[in-house]
Amino acid sequence: MGSRIIIASKNPIKINATKLGFQKVYSNIDFECEGVSVPSDVSDQPMTNQETLQGAINRATHAKNGFPNAAFWVGIEGGIEKVGEEMMAFAWIVIVSTEATGKARTGTFFLPPKVVELINQGKELGEADDIVFGHSNSKQKNGAVGILTGNLIDRTQFYVEAMVLALIPFLNKEIY
């Protein structure tokens, strides 16, 4: 198995979460992780579960097509979805290799009404968080999950668990 992973993002949180997730599963391999910019082909703020999953699939696919010299390509897409008057936040992780594809979703949490109001006005989640909580560039840091949990769950941890779950087909090739 090769050791190069292309992450379809230059966000340091997503790159680090990918490295940590792969290290948990493949502790005997030293992975080289490289973040690249590729389009998601979905809206800047995906507003449904399906759109968010599609964004992660598209990112992984574009990474593979644009940077074919790797063992794995990873797409991570954060999204939100309305549930009645409330709004939940989550992310999808898609891992592609030449042999298999793995997909998993992070845990889900509900956003506070002030953040929801700004999203309904057209702001992205990260921008809404910055306004409501007085932060700057929170989406490159611990994001909404870190802010709302007081960093009990930081954004890296939030992604790592789903990264491991997305690797299930690679760990169980004989049944996937």
Which role does the model predict for each range below?
Residues 2-69:
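N-terminal polybasic phosphate/anion-binding patch
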